[in-house]
């Protein structure tokens, strides 16, 4: 489900579920978490200074595997733990965004410290198409990376963010391919790791990880337990537009 290659101080982790557009099921989440943890382990045989994360095929990650176990009770906790591990590792994670990053795939891309984005890639949160709600961190981080106005368009209308616009907003640091991300990572391995670790920690401790306000949690739970979520799933199977009722 994942491939790992090591070139001196750069570990490249590749999501390998191209038949499902690298959609995240629990097994893939766990494999990815273990790989990231291994990179920062003191017991690791090779010293890793930078992680590069990419996807196999033409899609970076299509999001949660809605035809798999994405609605399992423990799925959100597994995803949160993966994000926590990526946040906690001392080395930078460079996302080589080789194609669309959608839903949970966009969350994964935002959890990366830097992003090199393919020209034909795009970012999208289609939650309003499925009746779902996002956690506060995802909304805050999106706003910090693309600006408040563009974040509103992406969240309220499921608007796509193309690579060229992503470069303008800061969601993309560079436009390029996996090789470009790996070359940049190789450059970073020559920089001072403790200075990088400090900067990453301060940047990530920006207040975006917060306890949801009671009203936020109420609306979040209301969305996830609504009939609209069921309607979206049924409509997807029946290949028709959903008829949302707001209930």
Curated annotation (Swiss-Prot):
PROSITE patterns: ENOYL_COA_HYDRATASE. Its EC number is 4.2.1.17. Keywords: Fatty acid metabolism, Lipid metabolism, Lyase. Pfam families: ECH_1. GO terms for molecular function: enoyl-CoA hydratase activity. It catalyses: a (3S)-3-hydroxyacyl-CoA = a (2E)-enoyl-CoA + H2O; a 4-saturated-(3S)-3-hydroxyacyl-CoA = a (3E)-enoyl-CoA + H2O. CDD domains: crotonase-like. GO terms for biological process: fatty acid beta-oxidation. Could possibly oxidize fatty acids using specific components. Belongs to the enoyl-CoA hydratase/isomerase family. This is Probable enoyl-CoA hydratase echA6. It comes from Mycobacterium leprae (strain TN).
């Amino acid at each position: 489900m994942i491939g790992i290659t090591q070139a001196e101080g750069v570990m490249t982790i590749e999501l390998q579920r191209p038949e499902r557009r690298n959609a995240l099921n629990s097994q893939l989440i766990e494999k990815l978490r273990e790989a990231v943890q291994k990179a920062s382990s003191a017991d690791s045989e090779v010293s890793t200074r930078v992680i590069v994360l990419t996807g196999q095929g033409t899609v970076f990650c299509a999001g949660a595997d809605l035809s798999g176990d994405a609605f399992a009770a423990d799925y959100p906790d597994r995803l949160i733990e993966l994000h926590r591990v990526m946040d906690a590792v001392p080395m930078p994670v460079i996302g080589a965004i080789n194609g669309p990053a959608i839903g949970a795939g966009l969350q994964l891309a935002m959890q990366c410290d830097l992003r090199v984005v393919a020209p034909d890639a795009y970012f999208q949160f289609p939650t309003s198409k499925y009746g779902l709600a996002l956690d506060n961190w995802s909304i805050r981080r999106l706003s910090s990376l693309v600006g408040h106005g563009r974040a509103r368009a992406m969240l309220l209308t499921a608007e796509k963010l193309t690579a060229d616009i992503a470069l303008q907003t800061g969601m993309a640091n560079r436009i390029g391919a996996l090789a470009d991300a790996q070359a940049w990572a190789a450059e970073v391995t020559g920089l001072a790791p403790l200075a990088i670790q400090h900067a990453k920690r301060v940047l990530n401790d920006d207040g975006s990880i917060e306890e949801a306000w009671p009203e936020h949690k109420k609306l979040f739970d209301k969305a996830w337990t609504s009939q609209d979520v069921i309607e979206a799933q049924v409509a997807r199977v029946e290949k028709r537009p959903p008829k949302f009722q707001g209930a």
